[in-house]
C-alpha cells in the first residue's frame, strides 16, 4: 500500500461513507510524480474536483503532514486535462519532428574547402549535444547548405530520442503572436523551453523586432542554462545583423560561429554528380563540368537545373547532350549573368594572371599579354551577350574577324589541353560566383 492509499483509508474513517463512495474513492494517487513534500491526485471530472477541493483538500494535506512530519503540498488535478496536455505535447513534438527533412543527412552532404569547417563543427555537436559549441551559429549565402547541415544534426538528435524543435524565425514569431492573442504564453514557453535541441533558421529576421527578441532571449537563456543544444543559421555574421540587440549578438558569438562559402569548382562537380545519382539523371562528364562552370554558387540552383534538364529530356524524348544543355539553360544563364560586364571579366582575368586590366586592352604583343587577352575575349564572349564587333571595339581590334580567330584558337586549346580547360573552368567559376 502506498502513502496515498493509506491517506485515503484514514480519510475514510473520518467522513460519512456516502461522501467517501461518491467522491473520495475516485481519487487516484500518482506514485511516479509524487514526492515526500508534494502529493499529486487525479479525479475523473470537474464536479468531483470542485467538491474535494472545497471540502477536503486541507484535510488531506493535514493527514499527509502528520504521516511525513514535514509540510506537504497537495495537488488535485483533472485526469482528462492532464492526458489532453500530454497528447498536445506529443502532437507538438511530432509536428516539429516532421519539419525535419529525413534526406538531410551528413552522409549526403558534399564536403569541400568552402564548408569543411562548418561541417566538422555541426558533426561534433551532433555527437555531444550541449557540451562542445553552444550555441553553434552557421552563416552564409542562400542555398549553400546551412539548413541541410542543421537538419542533419536534428535527425541525429531525433534518432537518439531527444526532443528536437526545428523552426524558422518567421514560424517562431507567428507562434508567439498566436499565443499572446490566445493568452496561452505558458504553453508557448513550455514548448520551446522544454525541448532538448532548438534549431532556428534565418535568425537575421529577428532584426528590429524588440518584443520577439525579448522572448527569444529568455528562451535562449532557459535552454542554455540547463545545457540544451542551440543551433542557429543566418545569412551573415552576428556582428553584421543590423537591429540585433547587443546581448543577443554577444551570446551568439560566445559559442562557435562557422561560415559557409560558395563552393569551389571541385565541390560543385561533386554536388552535381551526387544529385544526378540521387535523382537518377545521367549526364556525361562534359555536361557536368559545363554546369559546374557556368552556374552560380547556389546549390538549390543545381537541383533546379537538373530537374529542368530531366523534364525537358523526358517530355521531348531526346538525350541530354552538351548542346541540348546549353539551349535549355540559355535564358537562366542570361539572367544569372545580367550583372557581368566586360570590365568585370577583364579585371578578374587580369587579377588571376597578375597583370593590369589596361595591359589586356592595350596593343601589346608579348606572349603573356596575348595569352591573357585571348582568355579575356573568350570569357567575355561566353559570359555576356556582347557581339563580336562590340568585343572588337572594347579590346581595340580593327574588326570582328580578329575576335573570331581568337575564339577559334581558344576552342582548339580547350579540346586538346585538359589543364588549360580546367584553368578556364576555374576562372569562369570565380567570375560567376563573385558577380
From Swiss-Prot:
GO terms for cellular component: cytoplasm; plasma membrane. One of its GO terms (molecular function) is DNA replication origin binding. Residues 70-98 are annotated as: Domain II. Keywords: ATP-binding, Cytoplasm, DNA replication, DNA-binding, Lipid-binding, Nucleotide-binding. ATP binds at residues 143, 145-147. Coiled coil: none annotated. Residues 314-435 are annotated as: Domain IV, binds dsDNA. GO terms for biological process: DNA replication initiation; regulation of DNA replication. Residues 99-313 are annotated as: Domain III, AAA+ region. Its main location: cytoplasm. Residues 1-70 are annotated as: Domain I, interacts with DnaA modulators. It is found in: Cytoplasm. SMART domains: AAA (SM00382), Bac_DnaA_C (SM00760). NCBIfam families: DnaA. Oligomerizes as a right-handed, spiral filament on DNA at oriC. Belongs to the DnaA family. Plays an essential role in the initiation and regulation of chromosomal replication. ATP-DnaA binds to the origin of replication (oriC) to initiate formation of the DNA replication initiation complex once per cell cycle. Binds the DnaA box (a 9 base pair repeat at the origin) and separates the double-stranded (ds)DNA. Forms a right-handed helical filament on oriC DNA; dsDNA binds to the exterior of the filament while single-stranded (ss)DNA is stabiized in the filament's interior. Domain I is involved in oligomerization and binding regulators, domain II is flexibile and of varying length in different bacteria, domain III forms the AAA+ region, while domain IV binds dsDNA. This is Chromosomal replication initiator protein DnaA. The lineage of its organism: Bacteria, Pseudomonadati, Campylobacterota, Epsilonproteobacteria, Campylobacterales. The gene is dnaA.
